[in-house]
């Protein structure tokens, strides 16, 4: 399918999901991560442990405290909220192309002063050049019509020496192409890890409620 059609299809899917599922307990849209190491969490975050652990795995090697941070593809905001309160960035701005998801997240997390949610296009980020310390992206880029444009937008927006933390699902051929895009754009890959086993282990533990909710909301 064409990049435009692919992007439009994913946008429709996520918009429909956000509209149909305004439940406050359905705040994460990622698969989860389980590596046998128990991340220390507040009691209030325990129900979302596996989803939070994927976010933590993605950003745990960088220092976010006092930094200008961006999440691209934040969904319903659960991950951004947890990172903002746990790692204390100066400001975390979270973008998503679903205005309904952004509306939910903005309402749910309005009390977090270092966190904001905005509608935004990953392939045309509303950010100034060289303005952010860290940009991260969790299981979202497979929806984009042109991933190379997205990577270039991230590179443009990062300060010199900034970090891009990325995780998503890809087959062997497409991940090799993506690595080439990173390098061609100007990034240095300082660490990488395949986490298929850890994600599958998390999926085995995730309650069927999440899958049921998606199936009820999206035909």
Summary of predicted features, one role per range:
Residues 176-219:
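Substrate-binding/catalytic lobe of Class I Rossmann-like enzymes that use SAM or dcSAM, i.e.
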Residues 148-160:
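A short glycine-rich, Lys/Arg-flanked "PGG" loop and its adjoining helix->strand segment in the class I
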